[in-house]
Amino acid sequence: MMWVAVDVMSGDYGPEKIIEGAVNAVNQDGANVVLVGKEEEIGEILLKFEYDTNKVRIQHASEIIDMNDSPSIAVRTLQDSSIVQATQIVADKTCVGMFSPGNTGATMASALLYLGRIPGVLRPPIAAPIPQENGPPMLLVDAGANVDCKPDYLAQFAVMGEIYSKLIFNILNPKVGILSNGEEDKKGNTVSLKAFEMIKKLPINFVGNVEGRDLYGSGKDVDVVVCDGFIGNIVLKATEGLSKSIFNVLRESIKQSSLAQTGALLLKPTLGAIKKRLDYAEYGGALLLGVDGICLIGHGSSNALAVQSAIRVAVECAQHQINDRIAADLKKYNI
């Protein structure tokens, strides 16, 4: 039986929506969850829901790591925080994975400190799904864990991202590219050019350099895009901001006339489908690849759907033994 630890205390809006998502995962997906946080508060919220009590446990954690806390200090001094407690019950194999919508740096630091790295992994990256016009999402690796990278880090990111795309998104032969300032082989900086030479020697479906427009299905077809965490995090936040801006502009435009409002009513099912396709909550969170346990990091604003989706991904990663695949391929490719 696979259990997933859920940090219910660290989100922006309190524990109720996170607990709702966890209960939905139990009721709709058959998941088993350990809710990590203040036991009394969790118990009171659970009274609002119906669920199989054999599939929900509570792990008491009296402390909370704030978004403004120093990650490296917090994970050592706040040992009874929900982030640290969730990590530790993955480390002791009580749970196969964890999800936290809290301080990203603290979640990463806790995972590195208590779970450690998979043998052979140089630097664990964050793998973030980017919704596409059609089909499964594109995977952005690294989306913020490592702001400074060496070429061999990027080569490992390519391998880990390819495995994730195969196992979780069911893409048979994922196309892998390096994010660059042009698609020509000689475009890029010193690190990306050296990484290009390393990755093209690997037995993966490498399509070379890709440009920013390729991330959204408007150019070269690509499933995994590799970059350092500095660029990746900017891309991720810009993508999220642009998506919200487009829908806000559309909403305001509809308000301008009765004709537009009538048209919007006719298009409501289509607009709803588009919004669902572009909603990050459909994918739950970003996986911290390369740590010796499944660790998903969510938005502070994660809603119930995002939590449910993250729990589903955690279980799928464990079922597919993604970490064993990563260790085996890195060893086989000698990188």
UniProtKB/Swiss-Prot annotation:
One of its GO terms (cellular component) is cytoplasm. It catalyses: a fatty acyl-[ACP] + phosphate = an acyl phosphate + holo-[ACP]. SUPFAM superfamilies: Isocitrate/Isopropylmalate dehydrogenase-like. InterPro entries: FA_synthesis, Phospholipid_synth_PlsX-like. Its EC number is 2.3.1.274. It holds the Pfam family FA_synthesis. Pathway: Lipid metabolism; phospholipid metabolism. GO terms for molecular function: phosphate:acyl-[acyl carrier protein] acyltransferase activity. One of its GO terms (biological process) is phospholipid biosynthetic process. Keywords: Cytoplasm, Lipid biosynthesis, Lipid metabolism, Phospholipid biosynthesis, Phospholipid metabolism, Transferase. The keyword Thylakoid does not apply. Its main location: cytoplasm. It is found in: Cytoplasm. Belongs to the PlsX family. Catalyzes the reversible formation of acyl-phosphate (acyl-PO(4)) from acyl-[acyl-carrier-protein] (acyl-ACP). This enzyme utilizes acyl-ACP as fatty acyl donor, but not acyl-CoA. This is Phosphate acyltransferase. The gene is plsX.
